[in-house]
């Protein structure tokens, strides 16, 4: 009797153990799925933040160069934008771009001395300020491909050398072009020529 009861309890223990292991595996699988989904969302947010930073750096314009740099950095390659040194603005350029300042500086010396003698207590003149301020020049990136240059045709063929569309065409005003005698063979003309040719006897018949 005791052995039979032990045999009945033994399969029930294995069944409970089986369902327990199955539940544990399902819990572990669900936890892994939730973790991978959370990690995927986290990476998506990081990529979106990086894209926002790239767009802000590119001043909201699509830049193939920035896209190329980001692509290289993703694969572990170092890349940077080489803009080169900024061009320095020379004095001659400022003088050419601000001609009003030159007109203000061209003051006769005698007039200035006379004004100082007449007004000894006059205040010192304020330094001249240019009316226009030069904006910082940005270096322009030159493309490696040359720009296409389209040249016009130096001359066009005269209308006289072109065949007329009509007898009185607009292309020939006032009949300036010479008339051309073109022989057009019609069926009637060919029939008349054939008749005249048959009417003449051959020399052998004579």
Curated annotation (Swiss-Prot):
From what organism does this protein derive? Homo sapiens (Human)
What membrane topology does the annotation report for this chain? Single-pass membrane protein
- This protein's name: Testis-expressed protein 38
UniProtKB keywords: Membrane, Transmembrane, Transmembrane helix
**What subcellular compartments does it reside in?**
Membrane
User: Is Plastid there in the keyword field?
Assistant: no
**Major location category of this protein:** membrane
Entry keyword annotation includes Transmembrane: yes
**Top-level division of the source organism's lineage:** Eukaryota
Q: Name one GO cellular component term.
A: membrane
Q: Which InterPro entries match?
A: TEX38 (IPR031677)
Q: Which PANTHER family match?
A: TESTIS-EXPRESSED PROTEIN 38
* One Pfam family recorded for the sequence: THEG4
User: Can you tell me where the transmembrane regions are?
Assistant: 15-35
């Amino acid at each position: 009797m005791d052995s039979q009861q032990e045999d009945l309890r033994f399969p029930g223990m294995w069944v409970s153990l089986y369902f327990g292991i199955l539940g544990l595996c399902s819990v572990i699988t669900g936890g892994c799925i939730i973790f991978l989904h959370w990690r995927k969302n986290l990476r998506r947010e990081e990529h979106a933040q990086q894209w926002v930073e790239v767009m802000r750096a590119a001043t909201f314009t699509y830049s193939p160069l920035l896209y190329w740099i980001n692509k290289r950095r993703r694969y572990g390659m170092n890349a940077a934008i080489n803009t080169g040194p900024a061009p320095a603005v020379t004095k001659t350029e400022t003088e050419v771009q601000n001609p009003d300042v030159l007109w203000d500086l061209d003051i006769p010396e005698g007039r200035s001395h006379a004004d100082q003698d007449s007004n000894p207590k006059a205040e010192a003149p304020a330094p001249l300020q240019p009316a226009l301020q030069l904006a910082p020049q940005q270096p322009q990136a030159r493309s490696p491909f040359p720009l296409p240059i389209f040249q016009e045709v130096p001359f066009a063929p005269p209308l006289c050398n072109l065949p007329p569309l009509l007898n009185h065409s607009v292309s020939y005003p006032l009949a300036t072009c010479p008339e051309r005698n073109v022989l057009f063979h019609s069926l009637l003309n060919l029939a008349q020529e054939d008749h005249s040719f048959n009417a003449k006897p051959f020399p052998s018949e004579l």
